Amino acid sequence: MDLKADSEDVDYKQPAPIEDFASRSTLHGISHMFTYERVCIKRTLWILFFLGSVGALALVCVDRVQFYFQYPHVTKLDEVAAPLMTFPAVTFCNLNSFRFSRVTRNDLYHAGELXALLNGRYEIRDTHLVEENVLEILKERANFDNYKPRPFNMREFYDRTGHDIKDMLLSCYYRGVECNAENFKVIFTRYGKCYTFNSGKDGRPLLLTMKGGMGNGLELMLDIQQDEYLPVWGETDETSFEAGIKVQIHTQSEPPFIDQLGFGVAPGFQTFVSCQEQRLTYLPPPWGDCKAAPMDSDFFSTYSITACRIDCETRYLVENCNCRMVHMPGDAPYCTPEQYKECADPALDFLVERDNDYCVCKTPCNLTRFGKEMSFVKIPSKASAKYLAKKFXKTEQYIADNILVLDIYFDALNYETIEQKKAYEVAGLLGDIGGQMGLFIGASILTILELFDYLYEVLKYKLCRCVKKKHKGRGNKDRGAVLSLDDVKRHAPCENLRTPSTYPGNMLPHHPGQGNFEDFTC
């Protein structure tokens, strides 16, 4: 037994020669490149063909990978029939925000300049443009001698002077069933006091429709009350040159943004609006640019572009003007007429028309909108003018100037789906690369594993040989200083006690020769 045993020799299996591996590999062409034959021209041609195929494969794979990271998408359109559909919310506003007959002396004192009725000195503007009967009323109301103004609130002003649905609504039918003012909910927009049909608020169930076509939707006859329009002697954001109403068709979860997205309906016409519901599905980044995260707002729970815009505009005005407009949510104080004129209106106009960076609202990933086709006919006809004038106790001219009819209905009981889909996914990328590998070099994933397995065996063998050589070199150096038990027995030092003798001087390396009894003890 050795005093210090040498490291055991480990028999590492040498991998097969590359010619043997190539002969049984499933990689096409490699058996012709690594062969025991010494035909140089043939091997050279096979190497060139193989390298060319690998190069072509690399180009195609790079192209496919680049295409994948472009994240392309396609749009799928479909029409889906439905047994019944939810009727949309319909919001309308009179283009005139304030009724002239409801404007009081206190209103003129505070908001006369805002509505372009008075100048900064509380005087009537451009009296030569004023009709005589209107001028008399204004002179009476604009007499502020010894007048003590009362507190003024813009929300109350808009609510009190805005057009009343009970006065505007001449007739209302939904699917042939009569409706009334109770079916409309007041909502404030930038046009002031507006009304929404089928809002779903106050616990009211949403209205359904089971047929398409005219007569299966909403039909309104409205009086826009042009006699109540404020006289216009100047241009402000609160005055309007038009007569009629603004209408927006939207979902119940989406607040109206009627000044930007509404369409106009003129008096003297019956307007037919044929709708089709469109359900859009967009992809989030990196394939698309929709917003998948929930709404981060104190005012709205469901994300939509209009909710985002209103939320952003509200925050912008509160930050810059320390107040909010009447149609804006929140608990900040309402702007005064002076703040409307000096700060709120200019700031909001700047935000809407020129600043494209502050209010950037992404499209939601799921969106419902309503496509519209509109047509018009004249109302009243010559044959019906006298009847309508008699029915509503108005003149024929009043009927022609103020009456409009609005029909909104689904053109068919179906909806359109517009869906973005990923055009190229991981499965497609792997399929393309696998197909090209099979075409150019006849390889598969398992072929690649074969190559890696052989390379692993070769590297392991080379590495282990290097480690073994280092261990052998270190063992040879240490062996010169170690005396094994066999060496001791071979020289039998205890027997030499009876026969005096001496050991060679080099018996114990690195030590000087010594006497018999000093060398070992038996």
From Swiss-Prot:
<feature type="disulfide bond">
    <location>
        <begin position="308"/>
        <end position="361"/>
    </location>
</feature>
<dbReference type="GO" id="GO:0035725">
    <property type="term" value="P:sodium ion transmembrane transport"/>
</dbReference>
<keyword id="KW-0628">Postsynaptic cell membrane</keyword>
<feature type="disulfide bond">
    <location>
        <begin position="290"/>
        <end position="365"/>
    </location>
</feature>
<dbReference type="GO" id="GO:0071467">
    <property type="term" value="P:cellular response to pH"/>
</dbReference>
<keyword id="KW-0894">Sodium channel</keyword>
<dbReference type="Pfam" id="PF00858">
    <property type="entry name" value="ASC"/>
</dbReference>
<dbReference type="InterPro" id="IPR004724">
    <property type="entry name" value="ENaC_chordates"/>
</dbReference>
<dbReference type="InterPro" id="IPR020903">
    <property type="entry name" value="ENaC_CS"/>
</dbReference>
<protein>
    <recommendedName>
        <fullName>Acid-sensing ion channel 1</fullName>
    </recommendedName>
</protein>
<keyword id="KW-0407">Ion channel</keyword>
<feature type="topological domain" description="Cytoplasmic">
    <location>
        <begin position="457"/>
        <end position="522"/>
    </location>
</feature>
<feature type="site" description="Involved in proton-dependent gating">
    <location>
        <position position="355"/>
    </location>
</feature>
<feature type="topological domain" description="Extracellular">
    <location>
        <begin position="67"/>
        <end position="425"/>
    </location>
</feature>
<keyword id="KW-0966">Cell projection</keyword>
<keyword id="KW-0739">Sodium transport</keyword>
<feature type="glycosylation site" description="N-linked (GlcNAc...) asparagine">
    <location>
        <position position="366"/>
    </location>
</feature>
<comment type="function">
    <text>Forms voltage-independent, pH-gated trimeric sodium channels that act as postsynaptic excitatory receptors in the nervous system, playing a crucial role in regulating synaptic plasticity, learning, and memory. Upon extracellular pH drop this channel elicits transient, fast activating, and completely desensitizing inward currents. Displays high selectivity for sodium ions but can also permit the permeation of other cations.</text>
</comment>
<comment type="similarity">
    <text>Belongs to the amiloride-sensitive sodium channel (TC 1.A.6) family. ASIC1 subfamily.</text>
</comment>
<dbReference type="GO" id="GO:0030425">
    <property type="term" value="C:dendrite"/>
</dbReference>
<dbReference type="GO" id="GO:0160128">
    <property type="term" value="F:pH-gated monoatomic ion channel activity"/>
</dbReference>
<feature type="topological domain" description="Cytoplasmic">
    <location>
        <begin position="1"/>
        <end position="49"/>
    </location>
</feature>
<keyword id="KW-0325">Glycoprotein</keyword>
<keyword id="KW-0813">Transport</keyword>
<feature type="disulfide bond">
    <location>
        <begin position="323"/>
        <end position="335"/>
    </location>
</feature>
<feature type="transmembrane region" description="Discontinuously helical">
    <location>
        <begin position="426"/>
        <end position="456"/>
    </location>
</feature>
<feature type="disulfide bond">
    <location>
        <begin position="321"/>
        <end position="343"/>
    </location>
</feature>
<feature type="disulfide bond">
    <location>
        <begin position="172"/>
        <end position="179"/>
    </location>
</feature>
<keyword id="KW-0406">Ion transport</keyword>
<keyword id="KW-0472">Membrane</keyword>
<dbReference type="GO" id="GO:0005886">
    <property type="term" value="C:plasma membrane"/>
</dbReference>
<feature type="disulfide bond">
    <location>
        <begin position="93"/>
        <end position="194"/>
    </location>
</feature>
<comment type="subunit">
    <text>Homotrimer. Heterotrimer; with other ASIC proteins producing channel with different properties.</text>
</comment>
<keyword id="KW-1133">Transmembrane helix</keyword>
<feature type="disulfide bond">
    <location>
        <begin position="312"/>
        <end position="359"/>
    </location>
</feature>
<dbReference type="GO" id="GO:0045211">
    <property type="term" value="C:postsynaptic membrane"/>
</dbReference>
<keyword id="KW-0812">Transmembrane</keyword>
<keyword id="KW-0915">Sodium</keyword>
<feature type="site" description="Involved in channel desensitization; the process by which the channel becomes unresponsive to proton stimulation">
    <location>
        <position position="79"/>
    </location>
</feature>
<feature type="short sequence motif" description="GAS motif; ion selectivity filter">
    <location>
        <begin position="442"/>
        <end position="444"/>
    </location>
</feature>
<dbReference type="InterPro" id="IPR001873">
    <property type="entry name" value="ENaC"/>
</dbReference>
<keyword id="KW-1003">Cell membrane</keyword>
